Amino acid sequence: MDAKKENDILEKTLAIAESGYPEAYQFLMDAYEACPASYGPQTLYFLSCLAGGTDKKTDVLMWLKKAISDCGWWYRPEVLEDDDLGLLKDEQEFLSLKAVSDARYAEAAASSKACFSWMKKTAENLFLAVHGNTQNAETARADWETVLAGKDCWQIETIQSGEPDGYGTYRWSYDETSYLPVADAMEAVQDKGLSLIHI
């Protein structure tokens, strides 16, 4: 899966969806069908919602089955309560898929922990890349490595939230505890002889 390419396609899909779901659905479906291996859970979720927004109940179930049953992926429970999926809220097949996804989420949430990539100082300055919601440390690193390419005075490290958002992705809840992994990471590098730390 090419996370950068997938994110770019999803951003373009959102822009198209502002003018109409049918066009956005066709655009994303064409991109996916051209190279399915380049896309992950977020794309199948988008396809499900776009299909729902165009009243294609059979397609919604097809995409969710592919994600949850075929690929073994899962989503945060609230995500499958999206208005675009509302046409399935009483469908037994949808409820069964949601139950499987919810159970996988609960299992992941019970064992997930924040991760800080720091091992040792390798450059004068530290750039701490923090991912956004529905992303992960790998995404954050890839986004910032291109910006800092060729700047050897910077060491890029990542902090990943301990709160899962979906299969392979994480989120920050912006509550009284979600900032703690970042604060702990900052504290861990305070005495490492760095000239500058940037988040």
Features from the language model and the residues they span:
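Conserved small/polar residues in nucleotide/adenosyl-binding loops
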Residues: 197-199
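Serine-hydrolase catalytic machinery in alpha/beta-hydrolase-like enzymes
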Residues: 121, 125-193
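A domain-start/cap signature at the N-terminus of enzymes
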Residues: 69, 73-126
